[in-house]
Amino acid sequence: EISCSLVGSEMCIRDRFEFIPWILGTCANLEEAKTALIHMNLTNTPYSEQFPLAQLHWIIADQSGAITVEAMEDGMHIYENNVGVLTNNPPFNIQMFLLNQYMNLSPKQPENLFAKDIDLDQYSRGMGAIGLPGDLSSSSRFAKVAFTKLHSVSGDSENESVNQFFHILGSVDQQRGCCDVNGKYEITLYTSCCNTQKGIYYYTTYDNHQISAVDMTKEDLNTKNLICYEVITGEHIQMQN
């Protein structure tokens, strides 16, 4: 059982692998999480000897905003996250600093600011974002998904919003074979989002792009049992003839 009493200035000590279950089981919203984190410290206890400690990055969000929490060698760091995205290293404050490189990018077509005496043409759509990185490094994926998210336009319905979410994260998908690390390939195993008001969890997997969903309100949320669903794998193709 994961529990912690926050009384006065008493510190709450948690193992890193308990952090997310503790936050979700203790805090109802982002403001409560911020308050709880003031009194919190994370230990260096590994989850298993097979999984050594690493620098960890978490994003905690609700409709009011988001924060980033990072467990680093020099302790725990908490940042306001105004872009609402997160990737791995470098640390979040460096990721945000690197966005300065892209302040000239725009979803609109560019003006000729190179030289007024040279006739330059807009030979393609999307030239306002030339320079937006497309490689698979964490810092490049951070910049690209931040740009995509902050400029994306969604419809009003839930289905349209869910659809747009998967398009946003699809902009930084990792395809098998494009990131080779000693003969092993980094891929996007799954993509997911949640309607926190309705309790509906949506996901896709690398091998199944059809959006699957679990409605958590259809389960007994007060049970002490762990409820599991088999991940739907294998591409589901809708034949039209």
Label each residue range with its predicted role.
Residues 45-47, 53-54, 62-63, 85-241:
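C-terminus-biased signal that marks the final domain/tail of proteins
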Residues 39-76:
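Catalytic cofactor-binding cores of redox enzymes
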Residues 15-16, 41, 52, 184:
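Short, glycine/acidic-rich beta->alpha junctions
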